[in-house]
Amino acid sequence: DTSDLPEIVELESSDLASILYTSGTTGRSKGAMLTHGNLHSNAVALTNCWGWKKDDVLLHALPIFHVHGLFIASHCALLSGTPMIFLPKFEVNEVFERLPDCTVLMGVPTFYTRLLSLSSLTPDYVKHVRLFISGSAPLTEVTFREWKEKTGVEILERYGMSETIINTSNPLDGERVAGTVGFSLPGVNLRISDSEGKELPRGEIGTIEVSGPSVMKGYWRMPEKTKEEIRQDGFFITGDLGVQDEEGRVSIVGRGKDLVISGGFNVYPKEIESII
């Protein structure tokens, strides 16, 4: 008897799956409308880019009211049908105790700085973990270097946001450069543009814009704001300032609204932080 089972509804990839509220640095919260197609395309891209395996075990201690914990981390495991150790919150000692039981840890930079404070963190202790991923906030070059020195493993940093999910990632196999967020994912078109949307040459700082199957449908009940943020050619204006090297590797230098002009020179927050 299947009468008590929930009804199975036919869905299109363009159907709305989630509304994630985000304010960024612009004040009023905006509801980013993500479709089933957005979520699926990004999950497939990440699963492939990060080489998800059938014997992988994800250690999940991220909040699920945020795109990082709700979609980015959990969808890789769900799509691959692999186990997930789901912790209600990040507690440094509990996460440390579960590290030998996992193969992948996704976290924010604070996870890694707090774990680094533990003297018992050694290469042998984390030998089963093949991938440490960081996002949602910039990972400092100091943390990147200290983690490698203490564990023998390089953290993989990536870059994304609620409106686009993940845009770029450092490579699974290949050089991971401290202070960078890697290359655009397959299917993601990324450009560095001036204020008019004109693409800038490699090496010049400008606004990061992205297009592709993971870019949101728009902002919930905010059509004018949607038109402001998504250009007619489909590129979403992230508001983040960045630069690409000759290989296409992306570095983020700050938010456009945080730029300071002093004596005719552009001063970027990341430059100040690196000096301090």
Language model region names:
Residues E97, G160, G212, K217-G218, ...:
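AMP-binding/adenylate-forming catalytic core of the ANL superfamily
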Residues R191-E209, E228, Q244-E247:
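Conserved beta-loop-beta connector loops within the AMP-binding
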Residues K30-M33, H60-A61, T82-K89, L156:
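Short beta-strand->loop structural element characteristic of the AMP-binding/adenylate-forming
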Residues A17-S41:
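Conserved AMP-binding A3 loop
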Residues H40-V57, F65-V104, L118-S120:
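Conserved AMP-binding/adenylation subdomain of ANL enzymes
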Residues S3-Y21, R28, G51-V57:
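Conserved pre-ATP/AMP-binding loop-to-beta segment of ANL
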